[in-house]
Amino acid sequence: MSRVKYTLWVVVGIVTLLWVQAEPTLFGSTNLFQWRSGLVQFSGILALMLMSLAMLLALRLPSVERWTRGIDKGYRIHKWIGISALLLGILHWLAYQIPKWLISLELLTKPARLNGSGPNSNLSGLALWLKEAKPLAMEIGEWGFYALIVLLVVSLWSAIKYKPFRLTHRLMAVVYLLIALHSVILLKKAYWGEPIYWLTMLFIVVGSWAACYSLLGLVGRQSRYPAHVEAFHYCPNSQTLDLTIQLDKPWLGHKAGQFAYLKFAGEEPHPFTIACAHQGSQLRFLIKELGDFTTGLHQRLQNGKSLEVEGPYGKFDFSTQQPQIWIGGGVGIAPFMAGLDWLMTERAHPVHLFFCCHQIDPNLCAELRHKAQLVGVSLTIIDSSVDPHLSADDIARRC
């Protein structure tokens, strides 16, 4: 994560330096409106840069996942980049609007309008088209900004269900394209040919490609596999579904701790941790009833039911270089189930596994005990319905 943060700060620094280079007279100026123009451009370019990176991070590309060291970390970065872009967008909007409000209150004098390019008759081609398109670009940018606020607030609202959440992210790609068009038209003419111009155009091209890639439904397309339900078992005590699926085409394999998206007909894809090590074309999942999709899922299943699997993703690291303590709560035991399978063929330093649950699933606990014994893992099962919650003192005493 620190590597990604460092890279992002370097990019922000480069953008800042190139913007300063493109504004040679700004820092010696006392003209409020010259500063306003520079700040509007700078905040807009930075917001566009972050939005472009957020679009790229959402594509689940293998190269991006390697860079972020896991798609889960990538999505966390994606979230905070999106929030930062919105804050810069608000600064961009305020830098443009506040002087207008002060002029309307007669606290500022409206400056003479200078376009810096001479009479319109001297403009031709692209420059003339861009000038004529400015009013439309202003409207597009303003409404795109309002839409971005609404979509981001909705997507961050914890009470929102999964389908509306996915819809907001699909619409964000459309909003990005509108903001990109706004940026192309309104990027200051004085920047043309400068390094800041070409860097901004690069961000726009990359971000627009990512937005179109998403809108065309290409995200994860190369990692999708047809499959069917092989077996399933539901434990009412823990409200957990133990699902085994059979892939209908060769699976390229996965590492312990990775996850995949499951998509049933008429449903959106949902991510679940794979609860087994690589074992041919079968995958196992432990699914807790937590939301509108997972609640009652066992009642909608039948052996042979078709679904689509996308993955694997994630960079969960079961390092064997030092002793480890594994702690899994409820279905959070899934990656450690895969880890126990993995230890069947790997040598490791001592491992102590704590499994915390509320009301034990007898079948799952029996399986855990059997596998832990086979691979020499110390196992402690804590049922919070009868046992005290696990504490740091408990861990220190047992390990």
Name each model feature, range by range.
Residues R3-G13, W19-T25, G44, L48-M51, ...:
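FNR/FR-type flavoprotein reductase catalytic core
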Residues T25-G38:
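Membrane-interface interhelical loops and short amphipathic "cap" helices
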Residues F33-W35, A265, G332:
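N-terminal low-hydrophobic presequence detector
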Residues W35-F42, M49:
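Interfacial loop-to-helix transition and helix-capping segments at the boundaries
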Residues A54:
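Structured alpha-helical
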Residues G217-K305, H352, C356-Q359, S384-V386:
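Ferredoxin-reductase
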